[in-house]
Design a protein with these regions (language model features):
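Extreme N-terminal, non-catalytic leader segments
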Residues: 1-16, 20
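N-terminal phosphate/diphosphate-binding loop that engages ATP/GTP or pyrophosphate donors
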Residues: 4, 29-91
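Conserved lysine of the Walker
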Residues: 23
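Phosphate-binding/switch loop-helix module in NTP-utilizing enzymes
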Residues: 83-113
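Phosphate/Mg2+-binding loops and adjacent switch elements
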Residues: 105-151
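Fold-independent oxyanion-binding glycine-rich loops
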Residues: 18, 46-47, 56, 75-76, ...
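Short coil/turn connectors at secondary-structure junctions
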Residues: 8-10, 37-39, 67-69, 101-103, ...
Length: 151
């Protein structure tokens, strides 16, 4: 699937599954291999909980703690944009993709009920309901065991 990013259309493909199914491991392996092949890859990770990317005592943390609604930290080698949502609804995947720069592919971790094409990741020691079969956007299952046929 292609979505509109800052520089035009970008390919989007997801990796979905329940907690501890191996999503991050698969994403990291895919990013490593695709970048080795010369692709420019971005990722978006969905978190079900609050998180911080800066740390107590750092200037950016102090800016946010003082009430800044948005903070950008920039250096010669990278920049990060932190937006406090407060009472705003969570950002949609399409909205976040709109912030992505020129890339060959964006891999999305999470958003297991989105409309973008995805792989489902399953692990034998992390049993969970199957997503595939109930969601046409799931194109394949990656698992450490053979999967029984659905009845």
């Amino acid at each position: 699937m292609q979505r509109l990013g800052e520089e035009g259309l970008i390919r989007v493909f997801g990796v979905a599954g329940y907690k501890n199914s191996g999503k991050t491991t698969l994403i990291v392996d895919l990013v490593r291999e695709l970048t080795r092949r010369g692709w420019r890859v971005g990722t978006i990770k969905h978190a079900h909980h609050s998180f911080d990317i800066d740390h107590p005592g750092k200037d950016s943390y102090l800016h946010r703690a003082a009430g800044a609604a948005e903070v950008i930290v920039a250096s010669a080698s990278r920049w990060a944009h932190i937006r406090e949502l407060a009472d705003e609804p969570p950002a949609s995947l399409d909205e976040l993709l709109g912030h992505m720069g020129p890339l060959d592919l964006v891999l999305v971790e999470g958003w297991k009920h989105g409309t973008h094409p995805r792989l489902e990741v399953r692990r034998s020691d992390a049993p969970a309901p199957r997503l595939a079969g109930h969601d046409a956007a799931i194109l394949a299952i990656v698992s450490d065991l053979p999967l029984p046929e659905e009845s």
